[in-house]
Amino acid sequence: ARMAPAALDLVTGLDEDTVDFVPNYDNQFMQPDVLPAAFPQLLVNGASGIAVGMATNIAPHNLSETIAGAIHLLDNPSASVADLMRYIPGPDLPEGGVIVGLDGIKEAYESGRGAFKTRAKVQIERVTARKMGIIVTQLPYMVGPEKVIEKIKENANAGRLKGISSVQNLTDRIHGLRLVIEVKNGFNPEAVLQQLYQRTPLEDSFSINAVALVGGQPRTLGLKEMLQVFLDHRLDVTTRRSRFRLKKYE
């Protein structure tokens, strides 16, 4: 139910000749070639997929920021990527985590290809009367707690991770994600945390390869190009809708 208004915004106008319809794969019925899409859904939702000879991987973005960026480009067609990043500073990752550095994001926004690092959101606090611990409350995008725990135990057993006495998953519906990594006495929690970033998915990398179909042809798109394709599409949708309504009332 929460997604219903946004879903309707993607299809509003289908009954007003705003887009072309084409046969489905077995010619059983007609389906829209594209959706009218009242917001830049490719950027907002992100995308990931593999086809013959190509692949795409686009991070999700904040809806309000993406719309603000599109409006700015509409008002300022010569806007640079740096200008647009004032409105769209980076991806909005639903699982949370912390994006480390902007260089990879800027490269991806300029060229359509790039990578950036994400880290878990953590805090160091006392977990027992005598021991300190590392509390994980958010994980990098697409990383689950089971994978993290598995890697911690695997590296600790192999001697590649030192200073960890236990790890517990205390996640629940009320408090959300909570991993408690207990640090052995005599070890610096900050040093242990740096080991965890190096050896486990508490630090991960996300690669952007923004390939999308434009006019039926695959193209690698930077941020400005992606927003411009959306604006051109909306101009076409609005023009077709206006013609449909005028013809209807003639």
Task: Identify the residue ranges that each predicted region occupies.
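Cofactor-binding active-site loop characterized by glycine-rich and histidine/acidic residues
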Residues: R2
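C-terminal interaction appendages of subunits in large macromolecular complexes
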Residues: P5-D9, L14-D17, S48, M54-E250
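Long insertion/accessory domains within large nucleic-acid-processing enzymes
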Residues: Q28-V44, G49-V52, N57
